[in-house]
UniProtKB/Swiss-Prot annotation:
Protein name (database record): Serine/Arginine-related protein 53
UniProt source species: Rattus norvegicus (Rat)
Cellular localization per UniProt: Nucleus speckle; Nucleus; Cytoplasm
Post-translational modification: Phosphorylated.
Quaternary structure annotation from Swiss-Prot or TrEMBL: Interacts (via Arg/Ser-rich domain) with LUC7L3, RBM39 and RSF1.
Keywords from the named record: Coiled coil, Cytoplasm, mRNA processing, mRNA splicing, Nucleus, Phosphoprotein
Gene Ontology cellular-component annotations: cytoplasm; nuclear speck; nucleus
Region of interest (Disordered), ranges: 1-173, 201-222, 241-290
GO annotation (BP), single: mRNA splicing, via spliceosome
Biased composition (Basic and acidic residues): 1-13, 44-62, 132-166, 201-218, 247-262
Coiled-coil features, chain-numbered ranges: 180-234
Biased composition (Basic residues): 14-24, 78-118
Secretion signal span: none
Gene name linked to the record: Rsrc1
UniProt xrefs under InterPro entries: SRRP53
Amino acid sequence: MGRRSSDTEEESRSKRKKKHRRRSSSSSSSDSRTYSRKKGGRRPRSESRSWSRDRQPRSHSYERRRRRRSSSSSSYGSRRKRSRSRSRGRGKSYRVQRSRSKSRTRRSRSRPRPRSHSRSSERSSHRRTRSRSRDRDRRKVRDKEKREKEKDKGKDKEAHTIKRGDCGNIKAGLEHLPPAEQAKARLQLVLEAAAKADEALKAKERNEEEAKRRKEEDQATLGEQVKRVKEIEAIESDSFVQQTFRSSKDVKKSVEPSEVKHVTPASGPASVAADPPSTGKEIDPDSIPTAIKYQDDNSLAHPNLFIEKAEAEEKWFKRLIALRQERLMGSPVA
């Protein structure tokens, strides 16, 4: 009994050792397989089958189970070992970088992209459209200016050619004529040009005369306005006395001949004395002047020259005062 128990213990120990060896070999082989798969891709199925057949001729189901266990345990262990070695080798800097990259990717996935790019693109597009519109406006303005300049140049050329054409036509029309007829035609053209110039001068003179007449009429109206203002002032004054109305028509008719009589006084030695016509309906034929009568006193100088100096100064001062009053009141100076 003691021997059998010792034998069984030894057999169990040997079996355990074998199993442990197999597991270690299978783990190393699985590690090599995973490394080769990661490095060079998958192996063909024929190689893996031949390798498993050559190892140990056992039952198919047992081999499957062993493979599954060994592959799962070895792959898990190898992954943990590799991850630990990588993390140890890289250190904290890699972890920080990886955490930053992960946070960035999460933010980029969760949050939408900022609109700054779109706004900048919109602004750039707006700027492009604005610059294009400005360029178009400038081109249009330049085209218009060029067209206007071309039109002005064409008009100037036409006028210049017309002037040259007139001279050329005159010369061409006179070339086939004899010299005597050419001279006559030229004289006729000169006379026509002079007549046109005379007409232009006459038109200018007429315009000037019309302007003078208008000025005189305006002055006459100014005199009438001044008289009216004076009359209104006299009426508004305290010394005004009401009077009965009298028509001025008869007064004007009777005053006109008296004015004519007073206009003719001594203006010189050769003054004319005309008898005024009677105011009645019938005019005597004897009263009509038939000849010029001279008032000649055989005097060499005017009697005003023989007045004393004091009297002449007084008359001159009175004249100046009257002129000043008329100028201030606005009435025309006589």
